[in-house]
Amino acid sequence: MVKLVFARHGESEWNKANLFTGWADVDLSEKGTQQAIDAGKLIKEAGIEFDLAFTSVLTRAIKTTNLALENAGQLWVPTEKSWRLNERHYGALTGKNKAEAAEQFGDEQVHIWRRSYDVLPPAMAKDDEYSAHKDRRYADLDPALIPDAENLKVTLERAMPYWEEKIAPALLDGKNVFVGAHGNSIRALVKHIKGLSDDEIMDVEIPNFPPLVFELDEKLNIVKEYYLGGE
């Protein structure tokens, strides 16, 4: 039996300010830093030992991964970064205050953009200050792969190749895996792992803390699912 641990990044400065973040590269808040440290302590207390770690290319997830592994006494664990684990791209909503967006577009419309499985928010302009098209970390990526907006369906579609090529093979090889990522990229993978319907996944929330653990059998069927610390 293997363990797959998902840790959503700790609270970010934009989480704190109630802003849509998506692919914008925002740092952890002081609270978020402590959440990442505490995640590592919970991992250590649980006696979980990792063989591999995966994270996104966004600072808040990378820092959470590093702090969690460090405080679990496992900073040495090989870690791979991929844009495919990035947060869902919120398009033109990126950087907007969620309450102000609701005032501008209406509560119902913003709720649909945030919570529906397959409705896209307005696209981000390629010359937007937060556009990934001019971000050096994506310089080697085919521009056609860089999104201007995503829903959960599209997020799952771009995360799945990474699951199938990297994460699942490691688990099938008997390795314990840590994934430090984002609320929606984790939700997308949880939908796949649990076989949830499009409607069922909409009620699933991934908190910034504590980490979510899946114990899986040799065919990656779920044996046990729980949050560390009993929360």
Curated annotation (Swiss-Prot):
Positions that bind substrate: 8-15, 21-22, 60, 87-90, 98, 114-115, 183-184
Active site: H9 (tele-phosphohistidine intermediate), E87 (proton donor/acceptor)
Pathway the protein takes part in: Carbohydrate degradation; glycolysis; pyruvate from D-glyceraldehyde 3-phosphate: step 3/5
Top EC group: isomerase
Catalytic reaction list: (2R)-2-phosphoglycerate = (2R)-3-phosphoglycerate
One of the GO biological process terms: glycolytic process
UniProt KW Nucleotide-binding keyword: no
Molecular function GO terms recorded: phosphoglycerate mutase activity
Domain of life: Bacteria
Site positions per UniProt: Transition state stabilizer: H182
Enzyme nomenclature, EC number: 5.4.2.11
The keyword Mitochondrion belongs to this UniProt entry's keyword annotation: no
TM region positions: none
Keyword annotations from UniProtKB, A to Z: Gluconeogenesis, Glycolysis, Isomerase
Function according to Swiss-Prot or TrEMBL: Catalyzes the interconversion of 2-phosphoglycerate and 3-phosphoglycerate.
Record-stated family: Belongs to the phosphoglycerate mutase family. BPG-dependent PGAM subfamily.
Descriptive protein name: 2,3-bisphosphoglycerate-dependent phosphoglycerate mutase
Source organism (scientific name): Streptococcus pyogenes serotype M6 (strain ATCC BAA-946 / MGAS10394)
